[in-house]
Amino acid sequence: MTQITPTCAPPPGPTITDRTSLRLSKAIAGKSRGWKTGLLFAGPAVIASIAYVDPGNFATNIQAGSRYGYTLLWVVAAANLIAMLFQALSAKLGIATGRNLPELCRDHFSRPLVIALWIISEIAAMATDLAEFLGGAIGLALLFRLPLIIGMVATAMITFALLLFEKRGYRVMELVIGALVATIGLCYLAEMFIAPVDWTAAAWATITPRLPDATALTIATGIVGATVMPHAVYLHSGLAQNRAAAATDDASRHRLIRFSNREVILALALAGMVNMAMVIMAASAFHIGHSDVAEIEQAYHTLTPLLGAAAAAIFLISLITSGISSSVVGTMAGQMIMQGFVHIRIPVWLRRLVTMVPAFIVILAGVNATDALVISQVILSIALPAPMIALIYFSGHRELMGPFVNHRVTQWVASAAAAIVLGLNMVLLIQAFGFTIPGLPVAP
């Protein structure tokens, strides 16, 4: 394998303008400073972070909090740290090589392996879109007292409208997604002031690993699937690839990677806190007396008498915002996956239309919407090792990465994280076939 000189080929989706690229170049060279300059580097991780607060997180976090209280907060924290590591590696890969992860897979793997990776990634993208689309539709249906199908149609129309911002340029899309992320964060900040939280118990559970039974393990695996997202790993490399055009040598690429790492830490720390807030809210509101709450609709109807109409409305607003924004980001990732792996690009409206079809089929077939959300997260968890292993492989090769190759410790930690995810998936499959895990009690 020979080292690739960054080509900075634009990925699918919006691109940065020449003006933004020039401002980035000046900032990287140290010719401009200040908070406005810092905001230039905010974008890729913000867009990727929306994948970590999508409706799938709502479903799994509600189940975790209502059934096990604060017990599984440590899983959320650990999954968020793993997500930070792999999003940082993905961004570094895009900056160092000027290529995104699907493109590198296509260039360096055999054709059968590329096709297999593409199929796995497309299945994961559809599972992702199922969760995102259904989440937004459920929120709209509950808030405005609509049939779920009408909520799905409304979600589709809003998503199509937001995707039009792609034509306005990369920064416009970043600002739109950033505003939606901020809305979700503010909603859960408000919930924390309403819910009666035992902060000491929550803090202790965050640093104390414990799995009470087999169902807890299943939910924990779902949390990992909802927090570390395959399409976000692929997408971030392409979003960072856009920024690579502003870095013309190794020194400037090194500075750009440093800025990128800071953004990843900030954006995903916010996403992690939102996820922990979801579990804390569910634990505080439902665990004592309402531990059977496992569905989004149940959570909404139970919140109203427990914490008031305002808390229930805030919950729905955050769910709608999450579903619509993550659906837009999922479509962007789907474009990148298809073009990167098999060099096929279809119009964004057609991509959006195709990925919506499974959601309509699931609901028309009578499948419970929240069950579909949780199952989609398990599918994502099973699909996740493919991009994780590919990312470790490429970012650990000096011939490809040059001076930006992973440090040996980074490579070990990333490999250990991937092994943990693989292990969780194997346990999940064993449970799915009706076998029990020795030493792990079955839930009552």
Swiss-Prot record:
Q: Tell me a GO cellular component.
A: plasma membrane
Location in or out of the cell: Cell inner membrane
Annotated GO biological processes are:
iron ion transmembrane transport
In the bilayer, the protein is annotated as: Multi-pass membrane protein
The entry assigns this protein to a family as follows: Belongs to the NRAMP family.
Q: What does this protein do?
A: H(+)-stimulated, divalent metal cation uptake system.
Q: Which HAMAP family match?
A: NRAMP
Listed name of the protein: Divalent metal cation transporter MntH
